Amino acid sequence: MRPLPLGVEVGTWRFPGWQTPPLHTPAPSASSSPQPRPPTMGEPAEPRNQAKWDPYEKNISAISQNLSGEYFRYKGILFPVGIYSPESISLVENAEVQDDDIFIVTYPKSGTNWMIEILSLILKDGDPSWIHSVPIWKRSPWCEAIMGAFSLPNQPSPRLMSSHLPIQLFAKAFFNSKAKVIYMGRNPRDVAVSLYHYSKIARQLKDPGTPDQFLENFLKGEVQFGSWFDHIKGWIRMKGKENFLFITYEEMHQDLHSSVQRICQFLGRPLGEEALESVVAHSSFKAMKANTMSNFSLLPHSLLDQRHGAFLRKGVCGDWKNHFTLAQSEAFDRVYREQMRGLPTFPWDVDPEDASPDSDPGPDPSPNPDRAPEAPHP
């Protein structure tokens, strides 16, 4: 892809009151106890030994001190070193899938934890005890993360799991199973802004650089988990399958009650009105931000430094308009139209407030948006 014209207003998004934190916590001294190292590309896969991987969960704080902020490539996709490994991703690709498994799949910063909270409540019929007693990352482990990949066999049924994997790296067994995937999409402009903020406090991620630099990398897919465009275009091919639900952050933000009903229907777990209202109330942004089991405040600063910005920032739609410059908006729109042409429209395409200064109306809707193209796997 040719370089993007992002230099008209160089190096600034408008982030009121933002102060850039130090890039990374200093490395531990030589006297620190050595920590287990994930295998690197080219090393033979080691036997699945749960005892070997227990230290990752028991010593999160110590391990987080060794995060380098560097990435490795696995089949062309970037992953942060230390949180993921080639072996953990390979485990997911070849993992067994149970018919009652429930997967939440998203591109990063698309509302994953919101969906985890909702499903945690639905699976408990609206009872908030689980979300108030168990950390969110244990309720729905990340499949491809080192800790998640090796803990999946021990998860009780029905297993609730989360993933940012593009479709080509997802568990192959899923495509011949009755397991369910809920894919949550979000306006990529808001995703980019949220990911920029997150990259400032998440120690496993590279420093994002200037907003111009980060946006250029985002549009080229040179960020963790690769291209947003490739991610959503890959998974949207599942639309129309009985075990696949596509829903957007914007739909849920506009009408959470109806969205929860739709999710319950997809899961075959109808709720009474009282339980439904409990799900809606306890999964609100305000409730999640106040819940220590859901706001990631239990993580050490060396892993997620919320002294420089909250993990749960705003929970709104359209925040990109407070940050994008005119040049950035125009550059984004050009790439978006090129990448998304021919796909069905999304809620963010038809929002008049999201219209950019560019005169092109955006991607053309497909003749039949509800028709699912060919399956991604034989």
Question: What residue spans do the PLM features occupy?
Answer:
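PAPS/PAP-binding and catalytic site of the sulfotransferase fold
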Residues: N113-D125, I247-L271, V279, A287, ...
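C-terminal anion-handling pockets and recognition modules
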Residues: E277-M288, T325, S329
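A generic structural motif
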Residues: H132-V134, E274-A281
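Conserved C-terminal subdomain of P-loop nucleotide-binding cores
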Residues: R189, W228, G234, G240, ...
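Hydrophobic alpha-helical segments
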Residues: F266, H282, E338-G342
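PAPS-dependent sulfotransferase catalytic domain
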Residues: R2-L4, G11-F15, Q19, L23-I247, ...
